[in-house]
Amino acid sequence: TFAEVAAAVRRTSIDLPAGSVESEDGEVLLRTQGLLRVGREYEDVVVLTRPDGTALRLRDIGTVIDGFEDTDLVSRFNGQPAAVISAYRTGDQNAIDISDYVQQYIDDKRGLLPAGIDIAYARDDARILRGRIDLLIRNAQLGLVLVFICLSFFLDLRLAFWVMMGIPISFLGAFVLIEPFDASINMLSLFAFIVALGIVVDDAIIVGENVFAHREKGKPFLRAAIDGALEVGTPVVFSIMTSVAAFMPLFFVEGMMGKFMSVIPVIVISVLILSLVESLLILPAHLSSEGNGAISRLFGKVFAKPLALHNRVAKAFDRSLKRSIANVYQPMLRMALRNPITSATVAISLMLFTVGLVAGGHIKFVFMPQIESDWVTIKINMPQGTTVAQTSKVVEYIEARALDLRRQIDEETGDAESIYRNVFTSIGDQPTGRRTSFSAVRGASGQGHLAEVTIELKPSEQRDIGSTKIESRLRALVGEVPGPESLTFSSSLFSAGDPISVELASADFGQLLSAVDRLKARIAGYAGTSDVQDSFQEGKLEMKLQLKPQARTLGLTLNDLARQVRQGFYGDQALRFQRGSDDVRVMIRYPKQERRNLGDVRSMRIRTPAGAEVPFSEVATVDIGHGYAAIQRTDGQRVVTVSASIDEKIANADEINRDIETSFLPALMQDYPGLRYRFGGEQAERSDSLASLGMNFVIALFAIYVLLAVPFKSYSQPLVVMSAIPFGIIGAVWGHMLMDLDLALLSLFGIVALSGVVVNDSLVLLAYYNQLVAEGRPRAEALVEAGSQRFRPILLTSLTTFFGLLPMILEKSMQARFLIPMAVSLGFGILFATFIILLGVPVGMRLLEGVQGFFARLGAGETSDAEAAAAPATGS
């Protein structure tokens, strides 16, 4: 029997401590050592000894195979059988350094391999990281140059230089502040520095420009530096605090995207705090001297001609700017102040028109735009129990269609280098779905019904056709494939979940499956939807064994039946030991050719306690059916998820989800009482993120209001300052229209951050206006004077923010495309809000003072009437 063979193996292969002997020379350990470690040693194991002394050995009754565990895993690389090794960084290791080391190892190893074996360097995420970092650094450098050019037109060259020097000082200091947050240098952290690039100089511009204005009044350099910094110190401090308050909500956004983006506010806030210290302490110190040292004189001599040219251009630009202020801005502002209600009506109408564009769907909202990657992945799910051979036929068909598409595209483009870099195939596993490498999990036996084909494309910069287009063409070429339960195509860089995902739950499973079919049909009817599927999967085919009543008369029990069938088909584990790094198990079971079909079970023989053997069919019955691959439950009810992908050029997930919820699901729930639903995937992620972002935005607005109320010592003036925020949002929305972008979650991130940046310029303008009023200037003229005097710093801070972000806004690389919406919101929002601030804030202040005057007169009139009524009574 199997048990007797297993016992013989255990008796023969043994490694057992036997105690020790305490001799005069010391302790000696005793050990019985006879562990068999290789297959051929097991062939001589004596199973039993006959009465005549002859031995029945294991090789006489069976075959010993020293091999690997049965597995359903197959990997191919460019059509060739392959084994895949993945290397990951650990701890604080640098991904780029690890990549370079592995690349060098492969180059060294390639020449040492035997003929017919090759080693290739496949998917390298560090290469993508390196490309993104290079791209962002390039954008940052270009943005820095644009900021300096912008500063040099508005300010004295030396002043522009010292203002710009605040950028590297703040950036370097930020690396110290972000250390506790475990932030690393990656795409998002570098983007955060780009966001801060234009904003960080705002306070330095205000301080530097005010120092420059005091110099023009004839003050000595030291006095001008002190007076200029002190005069704007309060508004500068509070402007930084409002910016910090605006970026703070981004740190507390819930959901996957909130965690993903949390590094941005950490870095921007760190940079802003350091820029405040630099602008109020370090910058005035630099500007307090005339710069007549030896280095300055040498620099002036070497670059005399360029400096002279710059001075002429800067003076001409300054004269032109002053003429524009006097001849264009001031007349427009005076006209707006004479007609404040008309001006406010025009502004509000523009705001309502923009809101209507968004609400009417003319500007669409997508939670996470589809960002193209350099990969096209096809996931194949066959019915549970499908063999590797059957799955392989479907995979080979898809591989053939993928190669057909490659030939078509290569012929169309005429490029010498193919559009494909590599083709990976995995049968028994879906490694991309597990977000690991292309290799299977160590020790996994694989699942023959799963497969995946992944195509690596040339980098997006080197091809004219996008991965989404390639995915669409491949989907059409593959067509309907008989056999798979689901066939899913994807080419996005990352995803927050399925764009359409609805979970249906019911206690009645039959009712649930019927509702699932109706929902799938409804979703498939929307234009632009694809890969419509549900999460319910039938399990593998099962043979359920039962003992016949007559078997008990032979002394057999159900346990006997189960044990003998298990020994024959799964195996009886006789031993388990370690051989090198391998875990070796000695299994005793039927040969593989006797474990291939259902007839092998029916034809096996069952041994009775008396030692007799009877046919399986005489003592057992078989019931064949399907089990369940997995059972999902929520609150005790069965749950099935229906999901689908969409083509964003044709359909909008938000609109489809809304239509399903309002026009389909209510009727479905009426037809199936007890049915419940909830949205999952991207929609659930969106709900979590937007709800927390909205709540945090309200808190941030309140914090900004409180911060503004302190320097103004007023409850009403902060409302005038904050009135610029909605118009910044208008600029952000129109910026998306101009750039042909949909609004996305990152657009909202930019809008929230914009709210703090926009109020800074309004704060500076109204602070100067209050100063003029305190000096006794008429209010109307004070508004014109404040707008004119603060025109240059307001325009300059807005332009530096915009130009700092401009390279990112215009970036065409797919690598940075998902970051562009936030840059557009900030850049265009601040640019548009500038004109509203210069005209709208004075108008808002004019309206506020008119309302305050009305109530003051009303209150004074009531007081006079009361006094007049009381006078006769007093006289009497």
Predicted segments, located by residue:
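Surface-exposed amphipathic alpha-helical segments in non-transmembrane regions
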Residues: A3-P17, Q33-D70, Q93, D97-I119, ...
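Residue-level signature of catalytic and energy-coupling elements of molecular machines
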Residues: V5, Y42, I61, V102, ...
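Transmembrane alpha-helices and their membrane-interface boundaries in multi-pass membrane transporters
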Residues: L197-V211, G233-F252, K259-K315, V453, ...
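Hydrophobic transmembrane alpha-helices and their membrane-interface caps
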Residues: V145-A213, S270, A703-R790, L795-E811, ...
